[in-house]
Amino acid sequence: ILEENNIKFIGASSKHIKMMGDKIQAKKIAKENGLPIIEGSEGGVKDISQAKELCKKIGFPVLIKASGGGGGKGMKIVHEEKDFETLFSTAKSEALKYFGNDEVYIEKFFQNPRHIEVQILSGKNRTVHLHERDCSVQRRHQKLIEETPSPVLNDDIRKDLFERTVKMVSKIGYEGAGTVEFIYEDGKFYFLEMNTRVQV
């Protein structure tokens, strides 16, 4: 409504809010723009046999996640194949209940990763990063402590992370503040999602 009436909203455009609100689409965009993504399904997984084959390929444990999810809702960790069908069904039901869409996707589950976020500000001609925050101390997928700078990143990894994040945000024409989230383990970072606001 604001855009239709030429009123400037302080924040991301409706196009980018929609684009990054769908986590499957966000992963595709990140990959197309040079960010590493977590091994898993290319899109939403509907068929249980297809899902099981994928899990065998990437290996357990896996994480089933709601495409429109957030806050740990519609997200299930599967440690063994025998539990997959039940947890797959539960994740889809939760996704529909909380987000009105039962689409889920599957990713390799990292046992002890760091959760790193990069905040950005972007305008028509320039995107800048506001450095990183380490948000690894969590309870029920909710951050308890934010630490900056992250004690686990060295200068080379930090530089690479910032450059790739800024490049992706610039390429999609994003305007406003945003938070790009990553999983970091064993010296490698992987795109997780982008929030179209400064995440707190």
Predicted feature residues:
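N-terminal beta-alpha lobe that positions the nucleotide/phosphoryl donor
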Residues: 1-180, 184-200
